[in-house]
């Protein structure tokens, strides 16, 4: 009985800690000229030196965090950056936009056959209105804050990883590094990529939502053209590879190196 209460108490304290860390992110809503809007959360370095510029991380969430509450997008990944130790060691700006409930970052709708049959991601397709808003929000942020344009990074999980690779392909001169966790892309895009972005892919080997072959093939395609790319595969991990990815010893170190 005592052990049960202790566990409940520990969970309670952990929840308070997570909530406090998420509160470090300010809330905002980006509105374009046509009055289209997108909620986002924004983290700034705890201490900023005058005249110094800092990195920025654009983080794109997965399908499970869609909505308009401006909270859910922090569920997976938010505390990676707001954790006090990491915030001290890696001072940076972090941007977490939120995709609408019924929408997808890079697709007008989810592929009818999911991601297991062929490659449902077209090579040539117009940018979605949601990713366009993300790019506009990013550009506005870069113009407003002391951000080093040579240290703009992008990360994403699942649906957000698909969007990460989409954004890098569309804007090859914007991102210094890209992290894709259990994502997918059209392989021809990777073969044709001309930018200098460095890539790191994470994927679980038994992913039953987005097959691991997408990341394996993307890695091989980039590697074959001489790009700087790394690939980490988690044995026995399903479509939640962000958990071991975030706990990889050099997850942030690689990005900020």
For each predicted feature, which ranges?
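Bacterial Sec-dependent N-terminal signal peptides
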Residues: 1-23
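C-terminal catalytic histidine-bearing segment of alpha/beta-hydrolase fold enzymes
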Residues: 181, 189, 198-257
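Primarily recognizes the serine-hydrolase "nucleophile elbow" in alpha/beta-hydrolase
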Residues: 139-194
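A domain-start/cap signature at the N-terminus of enzymes
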Residues: 18-56, 92, 130, 136, ...
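Alpha-helical scaffolding within the catalytic cores
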Residues: 75-85, 182-192, 213, 217
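The conserved beta1-alpha1 loop
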Residues: 60-61, 203
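Active-site machinery of serine-nucleophile hydrolases
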Residues: 65-131
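Gly/Ser-rich "nucleophile elbow"/oxyanion-hole loop immediately N-terminal to the catalytic nucleophile
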Residues: 47-52, 106-154
């Amino acid at each position: 009985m005592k052990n049960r209460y202790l566990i409940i108490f520990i969970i309670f304290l952990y929840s308070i800690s997570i909530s406090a860390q998420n509160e470090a992110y300010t809330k905002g809503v980006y509105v374009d000229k046509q009055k289209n809007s997108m909620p986002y959360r924004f983290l700034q370095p705890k201490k900023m030196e005058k005249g110094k510029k800092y990195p920025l991380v654009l983080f794109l969430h997965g399908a499970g965090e869609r909505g308009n509450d401006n909270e859910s997008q922090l569920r997976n990944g938010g505390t990676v950056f707001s954790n006090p130790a990491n915030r001290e060691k890696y001072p940076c700006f972090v941007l977490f936009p939120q995709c609408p409930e019924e929408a997808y970052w890079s697709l007008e709708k989810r592929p009818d056959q999911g991601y297991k049959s062929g490659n449902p991601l077209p090579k040539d397709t117009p940018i979605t209105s949601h990713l366009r808003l993300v790019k506009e929000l990013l550009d506005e942020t870069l113009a407003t804050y002391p951000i080093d344009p040579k240290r703009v990074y992008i990360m994403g999980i699942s649906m957000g990883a698909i969007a990460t690779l989409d954004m890098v392909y569309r804007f090859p001169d914007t991102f210094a590094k890209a992290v894709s966790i259990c994502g997918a892309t059209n392989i021809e895009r990777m073969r044709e990529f001309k930018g200098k972005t460095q890539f790191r892919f994470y994927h679980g080997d038994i992913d039953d939502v987005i097959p691991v072959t997408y990341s394996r093939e993307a890695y091989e395609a980039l590697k074959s053209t001489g790009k700087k790319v790394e690939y980490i595969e988690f044995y026995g991990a399903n479509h939640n590879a962000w958990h071991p990815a975030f706990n990889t010893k050099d997850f942030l170190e690689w990005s900020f190196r």
